[in-house]
Amino acid sequence: MSDRVIIFDTTLRDGEQALAASLSVKEKLQVALALERLGVDVMEVGFPVSSPGDFESVQTIARHIKNSRVCALSRALEKDIDAAAQALSVAEQFRIHTFISTSNIHVESKLKRSFDQVLDMAVGAVKYARRFTDDVEFSCEDAGRTPIDNLCRMVEAAISAGARTINIPDTVGYTVPSEFGGIIQTLFNRVPNIDQAVISVHCHDDLGLSVANSIAAVQAGARQIECTVNGIGERAGNCSLEEIAMILATRKDMLGLYTNINAREIHRTSSLVSQLCNMPIQPNKAIVGSNAFTHSSGIHQDGMLKAQNTYEIMTPESIGLNRNNLNMTSRSGRHVIKHRMEEMGYGAGDYDMDTLYAAFLKLADKKGQVFDYDLEALAFMEAQAEDDDHYVMEQLVVQSDSTEGKATATVRMRVGDEVITEAATGNGPVDAAYNAIARATHRTINISSYKLGAKGEGQNALGQVDITARYDDRNFHGVGLATDVVEASAQALVHVMNLTWRADKVAYCKQQMQQTRELGGV
């Protein structure tokens, strides 16, 4: 049996299901490229049959990813498998992941079939998926609550039908490590053809045991772990990729296992997912929390000064978190910026130097000193920009009346090829800015969530504004970063404006295509 544990990332499928607003295709591609740099073996990037948007996302990612295997989910239905195969057909290497429920409560209450009928459906789905690829994964949904005799029968049948990976999910996060490890061990003891497949696990965190259960599973012989960046996912979330990677790296002496994960990309990938998904990382989160390498106790600090490994079992540098406190100013040249970006793991193709340096100089003139987290924030915002932004905010001026609490905002917007200047009042500067932007764009957006955060520390921190907006029965997520909170708020709104404009454009194109089909192609 191999000592390598395959990392199957499902941030863009299971993880995205937890978001208030779906990621755009471009945002999903950003995450996929980051996962490829991170070194995940397999990335599950969507459920193509569920919507045209998911189909497009899977197809786009499949077209761009070269080193990781791209996977799509499907129920044990031919139409689902057809959609997955079609979306994945452009990929260098791909996997079809099909599943069906196996626990008594799911079989009887959800599927309303007998177990034998469900077993036949599973076998049929695996055989059908094998028409498109040799790499088929089969999942026994709610395996943690499935009678062990039934689970053994299902696993043996799926392997015989051609599945090369068998996934054992603890779908509702119900089991404890000794119990879950025992399930995996029993499968190895009782399923005669189990050596013909890789055993995978997919653990949820409802009882806070997803990582512990996954480790127990690999100790029992499983060799694939399904996980997400920052542990995001349904309900309480999934097994955390960064925790699994660092457990296996840090305790290789005990576990004797390894992964292909490039740990120095962990911090960068975690930050990207947090920002794009509008899901802040709790400060005490293992590995990637802001307090993960912070020592407050005097005894601990004294020990750290004497020997770093007295209280650190891993280093910040090992996950790509650089301790270099070099401050950059408007006098710093391009070579300094390039050097700092390289040290943070960014290649020349990850950003445009002209755009980044211009933004850096503008920020340095405002702040004086610019830090690593500022550069990362600027690179992040550059990546969000679309070539075809319909709305561009060129200038924003706000005046406030401190006595009455009223404010006036004047905004100059480029709307398509036209430049428009509008002014409006509001209850405070942010409200005034939003009213002015609405006038300039003739687009009304209902804000359902507004979050103000910070990138960095103290008075030099950048303001980060995340908004969720409701438009045409869909949620859209916008983000803005600036030294000024009002400007960051305006940027977030303009970001959402562009997303909704593109959504309208896509809907119109689909309508035209439908009308063309109805007219027989005329």
Curated annotation (Swiss-Prot):
<keyword id="KW-0028">Amino-acid biosynthesis</keyword>
<keyword id="KW-0432">Leucine biosynthesis</keyword>
<feature type="binding site">
    <location>
        <position position="204"/>
    </location>
    <ligand>
        <name>Mn(2+)</name>
    </ligand>
</feature>
<dbReference type="Pfam" id="PF08502">
    <property type="entry name" value="LeuA_dimer"/>
</dbReference>
<comment type="function">
    <text>Catalyzes the condensation of the acetyl group of acetyl-CoA with 3-methyl-2-oxobutanoate (2-ketoisovalerate) to form 3-carboxy-3-hydroxy-4-methylpentanoate (2-isopropylmalate).</text>
</comment>
<dbReference type="GO" id="GO:0030145">
    <property type="term" value="F:manganese ion binding"/>
</dbReference>
<dbReference type="GO" id="GO:0003985">
    <property type="term" value="F:acetyl-CoA C-acetyltransferase activity"/>
</dbReference>
<dbReference type="GO" id="GO:0009098">
    <property type="term" value="P:L-leucine biosynthetic process"/>
</dbReference>
<feature type="binding site">
    <location>
        <position position="238"/>
    </location>
    <ligand>
        <name>Mn(2+)</name>
    </ligand>
</feature>
<keyword id="KW-0479">Metal-binding</keyword>
<dbReference type="GO" id="GO:0003852">
    <property type="term" value="F:2-isopropylmalate synthase activity"/>
</dbReference>
<dbReference type="InterPro" id="IPR013709">
    <property type="entry name" value="2-isopropylmalate_synth_dimer"/>
</dbReference>
<keyword id="KW-0464">Manganese</keyword>
<comment type="pathway">
    <text>Amino-acid biosynthesis; L-leucine biosynthesis; L-leucine from 3-methyl-2-oxobutanoate: step 1/4.</text>
</comment>
<dbReference type="InterPro" id="IPR000891">
    <property type="entry name" value="PYR_CT"/>
</dbReference>
<dbReference type="InterPro" id="IPR005671">
    <property type="entry name" value="LeuA_bact_synth"/>
</dbReference>
<dbReference type="InterPro" id="IPR054691">
    <property type="entry name" value="LeuA/HCS_post-cat"/>
</dbReference>
<keyword id="KW-0963">Cytoplasm</keyword>
<keyword id="KW-0808">Transferase</keyword>
<dbReference type="Pfam" id="PF22617">
    <property type="entry name" value="HCS_D2"/>
</dbReference>
<dbReference type="InterPro" id="IPR036230">
    <property type="entry name" value="LeuA_allosteric_dom_sf"/>
</dbReference>
<dbReference type="GO" id="GO:0005829">
    <property type="term" value="C:cytosol"/>
</dbReference>
<feature type="region of interest" description="Regulatory domain">
    <location>
        <begin position="392"/>
        <end position="522"/>
    </location>
</feature>
<feature type="binding site">
    <location>
        <position position="202"/>
    </location>
    <ligand>
        <name>Mn(2+)</name>
    </ligand>
</feature>
<keyword id="KW-0100">Branched-chain amino acid biosynthesis</keyword>
<feature type="binding site">
    <location>
        <position position="14"/>
    </location>
    <ligand>
        <name>Mn(2+)</name>
    </ligand>
</feature>
<dbReference type="InterPro" id="IPR013785">
    <property type="entry name" value="Aldolase_TIM"/>
</dbReference>
<comment type="subunit">
    <text>Homodimer.</text>
</comment>
<dbReference type="InterPro" id="IPR050073">
    <property type="entry name" value="2-IPM_HCS-like"/>
</dbReference>
<dbReference type="InterPro" id="IPR002034">
    <property type="entry name" value="AIPM/Hcit_synth_CS"/>
</dbReference>
<feature type="domain" description="Pyruvate carboxyltransferase">
    <location>
        <begin position="5"/>
        <end position="267"/>
    </location>
</feature>
<comment type="similarity">
    <text>Belongs to the alpha-IPM synthase/homocitrate synthase family. LeuA type 1 subfamily.</text>
</comment>
<protein>
    <recommendedName>
        <fullName>2-isopropylmalate synthase</fullName>
        <ecNumber>2.3.3.13</ecNumber>
    </recommendedName>
</protein>
<dbReference type="Pfam" id="PF00682">
    <property type="entry name" value="HMGL-like"/>
</dbReference>
